[in-house]
Amino acid sequence: MLVLSPQEAFQFERRTGSYIGLFQLSKYEFAKYGSGEITNPRDNAIAAAYKFVTEATLFEWDTHEEPTFSYRYLIHQQGWQGAAEHVSQPDRIAWKSMCATDEGREKGEKWCKRAIWQNTLPAIKHVWKSVDKLTSGAFVDMWRERVDHLHARYSEAVPKGSNH
């Protein structure tokens, strides 16, 4: 589940590199999972929901792991193949796990390294010093801890008995 902040909820045409709209989908992903206009919040949300369900299922089939909140975030961030590679090969260098995916093989080593290091928290960069040292296990643990922390904060903020 993805929770949007109030600031994000109104940035329908937001772009981050090649990712567009409310749920930051690429044009390819939107064409595959949705229809209509990528910047239309309803169309973007429907495509994202279909993408999240489909990729969580593929991840579970591949890894035999139930997609937790943190795994779902990892799937959204790294793609289902990237997330599956990270989870199933925790001792491998993380960028090499990305290069083991279809997209990684297509885009190459430089892209794989960027996909990891640009999504690594500063504190973890300080500990590991280099993308060439960061393991998939450490990368997964970093996001698990971050998502679990945010989920706990959100859960505490929602009144008991609420439907949120």
Walk through the language-model features, giving the residues of each.
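Catalytic glycan-binding domains that act on GlcNAc-containing polysaccharides
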Residues: M1-A115
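Low-complexity, Gly/Ser/Thr/Pro-rich intrinsically disordered linker/tail segments
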Residues: W117-H164
